[in-house]
Amino acid sequence: MSWFYEGNLVEEIDPKYCGFVYLITNHLNGRKYIGKKLLQFKKTKQVKGKKKRFFVESDWKSYYGSNQELNGDVKVHGEDNFKREILKLCIKKGELSYYEAKYQFEYDVLYYPEKFYNAWIMVKIRRSHILTKALLSERTDIQ
């Protein structure tokens, strides 16, 4: 099963983004899951006695979330019964965490276990993680 963003099939994502917030929907019972996924991560390798860091693409193309109940349903019912949608592409990790929590609170995922697989919300972010000078200059509500 593929990822969709704004109704379009996604096969590649611009490398300027670090990850995305997603919504997975079970078509059989309507339950949903909101989560986030990084597109790449850092690995280290010992080269000539020094640690070298490099980036490795994550498993985002085949990813179905970290929730065990959701993954169990995907195995039992098959990937064809689930839709994977990208809600928000994010440039920074802090922005990614912020928007994941924002969507989870917006949808009240903890109040409706019959509608959502999400069992907990974990976020720790600071204003500096999401606000940059460029972003502040774009805001029109600041005088």
In which residue ranges do the predicted regions lie?
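Structure-specific nucleic-acid interaction/processing domains
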Residues: 1-143
